[in-house]
From Swiss-Prot:
GO terms for cellular component: ribonucleoprotein complex; ribosome. SUPFAM superfamilies: Ribosomal protein L4. GO terms for biological process: translation. Keywords: Ribonucleoprotein, Ribosomal protein, RNA-binding, rRNA-binding. This is Large ribosomal subunit protein uL4. It holds the Pfam family Ribosomal_L4. InterPro entries: Ribosomal_uL4, Ribosomal_uL4-like, Ribosomal_uL4_dom_sf. Belongs to the universal ribosomal protein uL4 family. The gene is rplD. Part of the 50S ribosomal subunit. The keyword Disulfide bond does not apply. One of its GO terms (molecular function) is rRNA binding.
């Protein structure tokens, strides 16, 4: 199959990478797993065993007229422990390479079908200035875009830092969440070739 390149000849690409069927269930699973892996999972609360304080019985069991009490660290007391205390945990989910690559291929194929993938020969700015990048995006009628290059261009990266709806990645930095988060994905021809090799 062929991808149209802005201002150049069409680029021949593999149908297994850019012409794959849309697999919503697989994409959902991989995106959820990716987001779960980004969770910090470090929250921690103290149980009644961990709260600082005496284990002494505050008053005798009977005869005071007050409710019976075993220690001041009871969860129903102010400053007591938490009943079901949250503990640090690993939220990551296992996704094998075949599934991950399949999801990326499925997303790229859907971007092609929806005409959200914009292929260019190269994408550069002459200096790390936001105004140069804004003008370049305006020329392509874009304002919400993920830009993928074969290797990370420092000028381009610095120029994009101040733009809310623009992100710059190299091929190694792409992930399923960023691919579906933007209206358009701008990709260079060199990056397309690298992605094909990476997902082969």
């Amino acid at each position: 199959m062929e991808l149209q390149v802005v201002g150049a000849n069409a680029l021949t690409v593999s149908e297994t990478t850019f012409g794959r069927e849309f697999n919503e269930a697989l994409i959902h699973q991989v995106v959820v797993a990716y987001a779960a892996g980004a969770r910090q999972g470090s929250r921690a609360q103290k149980t009644r065993a961990e709260v600082s304080g005496s284990g002494k019985k505050p008053w005798r069991q009977k005869g005071t007229g007050r409710a019976r009490s075993g220690d001041i660290k009871s969860p129903i007391w102010r400053s007591g422990g938490t009943t079901f205390a949250a503990k640090p945990q690993d939220h990551s989910q296992k996704v094998n390479k075949k599934m991950y690559r399949g999801a990326i291929k499925s997303i790229l194929s859907e971007l092609v079908r929806q005409e959200r993938l914009v292929v260019v020969e190269k994408f550069e700015v002459e200096a790390p200035k936001t105004k140069f990048l804004v003008q370049k995006l305006k020329d392509l009628a874009l304002n919400d875009a993920l830009i993928i290059t074969a290797s990370l261009d420092e000028n381009l990266f610095l120029a994009a830092r101040n733009l809310y709806k623009v992100d710059v990645r190299d091929v190694q930095g792409i992930d399923p969440v960023s691919l579906i988060a933007f209206d358009k994905v701008v990709i260079t021809t060199d990056a397309v070739k690298q992605i094909e090799e990476m997902l082969a």
